[in-house]
Amino acid sequence: MVITDEDKNELRNLLKIATSQIPRYFNVINSTNESWQITNINECVFGMVFEKYIHDSGQYLSNKVIDEGQQNTIESTMEAYDIGIEVFSENVAEIKRQIQES
């Protein structure tokens, strides 16, 4: 799978969208805190950001494969997943900072 700089920028934008939801995630957790056994709210929110980003980036990269008529193999799927994880990993410190500030 060929990933362009434009694709990486799109993945970064998807990550920004996921992190923009941090206040909403805190609201969800706080509204149900009495019935959930959450020991670390910040880690829970981090997981919610991760799940949102992985879902959206996976859809973007799957659509890219379809739009470009590329073969969809397990290798190309894993390569796409690795690229998505790479973009996320580059921003972990910033994501955690945003969570701490919320």
Predicted features along the sequence, with ranges:
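Short terminal alpha-helical segments
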Residues: M1-N33
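Non-transmembrane, amphipathic alpha-helical segments
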Residues: I3-E6, E10, Q37-F46, T73, ...
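Acidic-enriched, low-complexity/disordered segments with a strong bias for Aspartate over Glutamate
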Residues: D5-D7, N33, D56, D67, ...
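Generic detector of leucine side chains in alpha-helical contexts
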Residues: L11-L15, L61, M78
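Amphipathic alpha-helical interaction modules
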Residues: S20-V65
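Amphipathic alpha-helical binding modules
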Residues: Q70-S102
